[in-house]
């Protein structure tokens, strides 16, 4: 049973301690509050998983996380396991303690494997797999037992009920029996073999003498054949090498002759090409002259075309500009008639007219400005009162903050004195640390408790003062900001009041200016807005008039400059656009004539280049021809040498066929004699080894016989153990499975009216549930929600009946996928569970559904505040 869990810097938990009771303990809170982390902390303490890094579990900004769990073991002792997980460093300093008297004794520490093993022993043999399959039912895995395959389901049931141990023991006995029987049969055969060892030993020694004589005769013959074989093989390789070289030389000579003929042909073609080049003359120079002439004509044509386009464009633009100039003049006449004033005079007074029109709106704002001025004055008065109030509160808060700071200093001095006194009392051995008189143990303990109690009171007071100081600082900062904001607002309002007063003075001046302007223009004041638009329009038209006149003059000058540029191209000043067009046609005809002559010359140029290439190839062919003739002479000389070497081999060994026949004959004889020698030596070595083995076997005969008799007795005992384990498992299953069926059926009926009873068949491989109508169906054929209900009932029943369980279970969000009715039924079922009756004495349930609160013997609420999990106890 879990008694207490402490968490430091694990996920969202900064510092959390929870004490659990026997019965149902419920941790309730919204999603993301950190409920499941409590179950993860228990799992990390008891059976930690091995990660490459635990950084993802350590709280952000912290160096390490610590989990500590106090639990009751299967032996009735209380244990405490503590583990530390470091960022980037894995698990360190794991320790397991057992309570003894008033203190804790270390059971295991240092190596994580040692601590894991002792934790498993303390829980009555529950290992990591059983814990994760049965004790800790994780979110979304309630239906795992129902949805598993038959073999997997049977394996889980056996492990959770302790039946797997019988199977494991029987399998071990079976394996030992198999090994023992194999060894027994081996020794039986050995005993039988050893009986004839003496007779076989004499026979082997006779055969050894015969084999040694035979080896002595065969070894000289093998050496003689080996030497002759090497000589013949070398001769064959030389035959093959020389014949291969001969063929290569003959092919090379033929190839060189063919290449020599080709090169001579190229040389003759080069001579003919040189004569043809002399006849053609300097064709490239002729082509370059025609290309330059054509390029110059193209340049002049392109330039003249561009000038012609410019002339046409300028003529069109000049006509458009003259039409636009006349249009602007007409608009100015119309504006003069509409305004009754010359446009030039309107433009002269435009700025005054516009300003007067704009400021006429200010006259209408006079009353509005007076109201705003009155409102600003009233607000300034109110803010002055608020400033005095805030200043007074700020001074009072600062005074209280100074008082708290002084009291905190006094408390820290007292705490230091108390800590020194406590340390002295703990180190003192029967005498007062102050007066050094003899101090009774009871008196010393009372003084120590009083000092610790006073220290605890001071620490509590210090925490209260620190909390009040934080609140005062927050309020002081809030008042300071509001006071600064008030002063800033008053300064802005004073500026606004001065601005409004200036605007009212300007309005009085404006009235006088408008009257003067109306008299000067000879119009009424109410016509000023109308004249403003006309003045703006008159100014725009006058500017447009000047711009149009400038455009006409500019286009006329540009047209003259373009005609001057045409003179540079055609050599005279053209009379107009038509004259330029006629000159352009003449240049294009001349360009076409030159182009025709160029194409004819380019045809001759291509033939000229081909002839040059032939001359070049002929020069290269002359050089290569000399090299080919030298190579040909060398190849003929080497060919004669190879033929002489081949003739010498034939005189010594005859023809190549005769050499091949002799080589084949010698190889066969050599292999035959060598194989026979190897066989004899192999037999000889085998016989010698066999002789040594037989000598050892004779000595071991009695020992083998004794071991055979002992193994016969062991086989008899193991056969009996195997049957005992099988029978014990069957008896245990017949006893335990009906109890699981009864408990699961009861819980299932509490969870839903739809179901009757639950059956476990085929030793746990098949789960059947009765439905309305009285018939049973397999649980794995039901819907997802039904599987969850059945899986939950079966898990709880296994926990209550199982013999290999720790005396507690943990449920993580068991209401997921359950509707409201089934959540209420689950709560009712948990309330009615008699946890003290079976081995399961405690259930720890994590949920976000408040329906399970009524089922709790102990209720804890977890919330996440500003990224940190906070735990509050609500019952107990």
Curated annotation (Swiss-Prot):
Cofactor annotation remark: Binds 1 zinc ion per homodimer.
Task: Note the InterPro entries from the entry.
Answer: AAA+_ATPase, ATPase_AAA_core, P-loop_NTPase, Rad50/SbcC_AAA, Rad50_ATPase_archaeal, Zn_hook_RAD50
Q: Name one GO molecular function term.
A: ATP hydrolysis activity
Q: Does the keyword Nucleotide-binding apply?
A: yes
Q: Which Gene3D superfamilies match?
A: Helix hairpin bin, P-loop containing nucleotide triphosphate hydrolases
Q: Which UniProt keywords apply?
A: ATP-binding, Coiled coil, DNA damage, DNA repair, Hydrolase, Metal-binding, Nucleotide-binding, Zinc
Q: Answer whether the UniProt record assigns the keyword DNA repair to this protein.
A: yes
Q: Which GO terms describe its biological process?
A: double-strand break repair
Report which residue ranges the record marks as coiled coil. Answer: 188-528, 575-710
At which positions is Zn(2+) bound?
Answer: 432, 435
- Tell me which residues bind ATP: 11, 31-37, 139
Q: This protein's superkingdom?
A: Archaea
Cofactors named for this entry: Zn(2+)
The residue ranges of the Zinc-hook domain are 387-484
Q: Which Pfam families match?
A: AAA_21, AAA_23, Rad50_zn_hook
Functionally, this protein is described as follows: Part of the Rad50/Mre11 complex, which is involved in the early steps of DNA double-strand break (DSB) repair. The complex may facilitate opening of the processed DNA ends to aid in the recruitment of HerA and NurA. Rad50 controls the balance between DNA end bridging and DNA resection via ATP-dependent structural rearrangements of the Rad50/Mre11 complex.
- What is written about domains in the entry's comments? The two conserved Cys that bind zinc constitute the zinc-hook, which separates the large intramolecular coiled coil regions. The 2 Cys residues coordinate one molecule of zinc with the help of the 2 Cys residues of the zinc-hook of another Rad50 molecule, thereby forming a V-shaped homodimer.
Member of which family?
A: Belongs to the SMC family. RAD50 subfamily.
Q: How does it assemble?
A: Homodimer. Forms a heterotetramer composed of two Mre11 subunits and two Rad50 subunits.
Q: What protein name does the entry list?
A: DNA double-strand break repair Rad50 ATPase
Question: Gene encoding this polypeptide?
Answer: rad50
């Amino acid at each position: 049973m879990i008694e207490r869990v402490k968490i430091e810097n694990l996920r969202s938990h900064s510092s959390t301690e929870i004490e659990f009771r026997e019965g149902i303990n419920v941790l309730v809170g919204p999603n993301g509050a950190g409920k499941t982390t409590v179950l993860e902390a228990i799992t990390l303490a008891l059976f930690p998983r091995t990660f490459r890094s635990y950084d993802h579990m350590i709280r952000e900004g912290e160096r390490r996380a610590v989990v500590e769990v106090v639990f009751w073991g299967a032996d009735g002792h209380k244990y405490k396991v503590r583990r530390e997980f470091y960022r980037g460093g894995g698990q360190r300093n794991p320790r397991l303690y057992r309570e003894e008297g008033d203190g804790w004794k270390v059971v295991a520490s240092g190596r994580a494997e040692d601590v894991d093993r002792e934790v498993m022993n303390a829980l009555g043999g529950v290992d990591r797999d059983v814990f994760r399959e049965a004790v800790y039912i994780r979110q979304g895995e309630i239906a795992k037992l129902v949805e598993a395959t038959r073999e997997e389901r049977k394996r889980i049931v056996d492990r959770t009920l302790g039946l797997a141990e019988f199977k494991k023991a029987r399998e071990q006995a079976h394996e030992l029996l198999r090994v023992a029987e194999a060894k027994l049969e081996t020794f039986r055969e050995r005993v039988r073999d050893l009986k004839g060892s003496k007779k076989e030993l004499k026979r082997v020694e006779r055969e050894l003498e015969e084999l040694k004589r035979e080896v002595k005769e065969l070894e000289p013959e093998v050496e003689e054949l080996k030497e002759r074989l090497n000589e013949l093989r070398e001769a064959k390789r030389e035959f093959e090498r020389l014949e291969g070289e001969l063929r290569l030389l003959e092919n090379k000579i033929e190839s060189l002759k063919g290449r020599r003929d080709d090169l001579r042909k190229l040389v003759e073609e080069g001579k003919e090409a040189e004569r043809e080049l002399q006849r053609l003359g300097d064709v490239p120079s002729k082509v370059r002259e025609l290309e330059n002439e054509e390029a110059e004509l193209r340049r002049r044509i392109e330039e003249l075309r561009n000038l012609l386009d410019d002339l046409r464009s300028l003529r069109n633009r000049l006509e458009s500009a003259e039409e636009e100039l006349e249009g602007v003049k007409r608009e100015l006449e119309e504006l003069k008639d509409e305004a009754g004033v010359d446009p030039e005079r309107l433009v002269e007074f435009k700025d005054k007219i516009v300003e007067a029109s704009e400021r006429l709106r200010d006259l209408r704002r006079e009353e509005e400005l007076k109201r705003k001025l009155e409102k600003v004055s009233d607000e300034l008065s109110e803010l002055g009162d608020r400033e005095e109030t805030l200043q007074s509160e700020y001074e009072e808060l600062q005074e209280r903050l100074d008082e708290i700071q002084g009291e905190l200093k006094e408390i820290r001095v007292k705490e230091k004195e108390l800590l020194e006194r406590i340390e002295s009392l703990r180190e003192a051995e029967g005498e007062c640390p102050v007066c050094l008189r003899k101090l009774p143990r009871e008196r010393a303990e009372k003084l120590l408790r009083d000092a610790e109690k006073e220290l605890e009171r001071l620490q509590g007071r210090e925490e209260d003062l620190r909390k009040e100081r934080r609140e005062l600082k927050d309020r002081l900062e809030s008042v300071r900001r509001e006071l600064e904001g008030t002063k800033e607002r008053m300064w802005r309002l004073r500026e606004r009041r001065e601005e409004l007063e200036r605007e009212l003075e300007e309005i009085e001046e404006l009235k006088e200016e408008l009257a003067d302007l109306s008299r000067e223009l000879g119009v009424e004041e109410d016509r000023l807005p109308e004249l403003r638009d006309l003045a703006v329009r008159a100014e725009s038209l006058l500017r447009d008039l000047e711009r149009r006149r400038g455009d006409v003059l500019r286009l006329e000058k540009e047209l003259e400059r373009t005609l001057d540029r045409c003179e540079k191209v055609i050599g005279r000043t053209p009379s107009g656009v038509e004259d330029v067009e006629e000159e352009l046609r003449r240049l294009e005809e001349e360009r076409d004539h030159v182009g025709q002559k160029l194409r004819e010359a380019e045809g001759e140029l291509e033939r000229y280049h081909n002839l040059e290439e032939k001359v070049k190839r002929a020069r290269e062919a002359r050089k290569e021809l000399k090299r080919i003739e030298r190579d040909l002479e060398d190849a003929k000389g080497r060919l004669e040498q190879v033929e002489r070497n081949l003739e010498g081999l034939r005189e010594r060994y005859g023809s190549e066929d005769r050499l091949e026949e002799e080589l084949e004959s010698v190889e066969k004889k050599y292999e035959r004699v060598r194989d026979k020698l190897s066989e004899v030596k192999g037999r000889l070595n085998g016989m010698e080894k066999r002789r040594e083995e037989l000598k050892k076997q004779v000595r071991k005969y009695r020992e083998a016989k004794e071991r055979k008799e002992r193994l016969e007795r062991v086989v008899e005992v193991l056969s009996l153990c195997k049957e005992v384990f099988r029978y014990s498992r069957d008896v245990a299953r017949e006893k335990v499975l009906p109890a699981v069926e009864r408990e699961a059926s009861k819980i299932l009926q509490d969870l839903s009216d739809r179901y009757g009873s639950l059956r476990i068949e085929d030793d746990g491989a098949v789960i059947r549930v009765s439905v309305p109508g009285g018939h049973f169906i397999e649980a794995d054929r039901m819907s997802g929600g039904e599987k969850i209900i059945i899986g939950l009932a079966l898990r709880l029943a296994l926990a209550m009946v199982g013999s290999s369980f720790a005396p507690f279970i943990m449920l993580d969000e068991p209401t997921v996928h359950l509707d409201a009715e089934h959540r209420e039924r689950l709560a009712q079922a948990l309330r009615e569970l008699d946890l003290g009756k079976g081995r399961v004495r405690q259930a720890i349930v994590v949920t976000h559904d408040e329906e399970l609160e009524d089922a709790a013997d102990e209720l804890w609420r977890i919330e996440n505040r500003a990224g940190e999990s906070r735990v509050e106890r609500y019952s107990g």
